[in-house]
A protein has these predicted regions:
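Surface-exposed, low-hydrophobicity beta-strand/loop segments enriched in small/polar/acidic residues
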Residues: 1-187
Length: 187
């Protein structure tokens, strides 16, 4: 059966040690001009906050929503995504930043079990303003020994585990040399 092509970003599914999956709080600068969607990879920036992470950049973690005071209504607001250019001084991002969290993510091409322990970069920065979900995927064409994420298995999801067809889901962890907490140098 063909896999469902429905990218959803990076979804935390378990912890390598059996521990709890937790989020930590980080700032997003007021008026940051790029939307960040739930399930989208983010990077740490020198100013102490987080921003959207592109292919090849060092990953801090995966965005899990945000909280801010709405600049129009002055009401406290929890949002599944960060609306670009929000002018609030109290924006808090919730980030799954533990490098031992296993995420489920969709391949943009044909991902196979033979690719386990290969590294991949991410692709895409878009998402839905209705659901707040990211549409990031693994860039199947970047399968190498390095990359932002390491595939550790193929998903058990019956709708997206056919490795003979495009868009199979994979289980991934952040690659050691591509995660902020595992670097030996500062940002």
């Amino acid at each position: 059966m063909a896999n469902k092509d429905g990218a959803f970003g990076f979804r935390p599914v378990r912890h390598l040690t059996g521990g709890l999956i937790r989020r930590n709080e980080y700032k997003i600068a007021a008026n940051y001009g790029t939307a960040i969607y739930h399930g989208q990879a983010v990077k740490a920036v020198a100013a102490g906050g987080v921003e959207s992470c592109g292919a090849g950049e060092v990953v801090l973690g995966v965005f899990g929503g945000c909280f801010f005071t709405d600049p129009t209504t002055s009401k406290p607001t929890f949002s599944n995504y960060y609306p670009a250019s929000t002018n609030a001084s109290d924006i808090v991002a919730y980030v799954y930043d533990d490098p031992r969290i296993v995420f489920e993510v969709q391949h943009d091409g044909t991902g196979t079990a033979a690719m386990n322990f290969s590294g991949f970069d991410l692709v895409g920065t878009g998402g839905s303003t209705l659901s707040g979900r990211s549409t990031q995927e693994l860039d199947t064409s970047t399968s190498t020994t390095s990359g932002q994420f390491k595939q550790v298995g193929i998903s058990k999801d019956p709708n997206n585990s056919d490795t003979s067809a495009a868009n199979a889901n994979a289980y991934v962890v952040p690659n050691v040399g591509e995660h902020t907490w595992l670097l030996t140098t500062a940002i």
